[in-house]
Amino acid sequence: MNIAKHRKERVICMKKGVFAAVKKDGSVYYRASITFRCKHISLGSFTSEAEAHGAYQSADKLLSATVPITPEDYQETQFPLLPFSKWISLLNFKNNGIYIKTPIYLRKKYFQYYLSSEETLLFDVDDLFFYSNHAIMKRGGHLFVAEYGMQTNIRSRYGIRAYARKDIDFTFVNGNENDYRYSNLNVLNPYHGVTIVHDNGHTEYIAKLHLNGNYLIGRFPSLIEAAIAYNKAVDFACMHGCTKQFPQNYIDSLSSKEYLAYYKKITLPDRLLSYRFS
């Protein structure tokens, strides 16, 4: 069969909002789209013309509705074949006048990001540009975005380290673990190589460096001292031939003079000083 001819014939009889496209292997699939407020919006790709047209009909039903609709009104049976993420984008465009390709719904002073019809994340408007251009994925309870060819945990945007422990290194102030508004995030330990330990009403800060296993650098009375001790251990390792790339702690609250005073006071353990890096 002549694919170009087949495609032309199919386009002629396409239902409203649907057009056919041809894959590299020659198979035909169907795209749905709709125009609203002078904006042409793709609704997705489908295996059949009927499915694509069904998505168009659901989108048209939503956008032409005369009664108020909110995200809480969503029912899959009322809008079949239209992906929920696209339904949210269209509803936000209809109600708030802004089309966003990711499943975001704008509220006053914050926005909701819909992972599904049943799971929502909350963010401050300061993060709107970023999440408008980065889709959030969930895997194993962790939330990621694709950034510079890598998957980045969204918590890193808020100073929460990859292995941070909830209620020890950070807390959600109101208890809602899906609320990433800045006022709800309390980062207790933003530093690499530092562990906070609470024992019988006493708190200590343990600095460690991971070489072939964890090397204890020391136990300190303050978070900042432990963070600087870790930095000093990293400097020592790098100066003695260690090729591993360690992240450094940046401590904005100290002047260079104050930082140096702490740095000089810290003594590295003999076990680390005698370690053979090569």
Indicate where each model-derived feature is located.
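Boundary-flanking segments of nucleic-acid-binding domains in nuclear regulatory proteins
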Residues: N2-S278
